[in-house]
């Protein structure tokens, strides 16, 4: 077991609005993560480092584009919890020793967060895989998911989904270039790539 600290340097990076609310939510999301990850410190470290990187990029997008009207506080909160479901998945390369297919981590995380009373955060979980997954994608690829659309709808969902594509949990110390992120998302199909490119034009 390692002694690396997995906590972000500040409860809400970049000074998100609402100091008291920020600290309060920091306590809440850490309690949620600890509830599921306390016995898996290596996986917790991967989750926290990845989530903080995604949150920071998402906040930079919010700051660069105030015209989007994104809820900065919610963006940070949801980014820190968007991958909570990986603990149930079978992906030993990133210390996940569960039983579920990795493609399911979004809907698994959504179920976990709904149980915690966090409906809006749950929607981010289930809509962030790839550039969102359509029912047609799921049927065509024969993924073990409900035949429903899991596509980012709100601006906050879109920002987090986009920011997430620049960071891999396999290499938590690296940030992908735009070209690398595009290559990753292209694996999900042309529709996903087109959504990503639209976000790229809007957010960069």
Feature-to-residue mapping (PLM):
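Acidic/His-rich, divalent-metal-binding segments that scaffold phosphate/diphosphate chemistry
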Residues: 21-102
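Divalent metal-dependent catalytic cores for phosphoryl transfer on phosphate-bearing substrates
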Residues: 67-174, 178
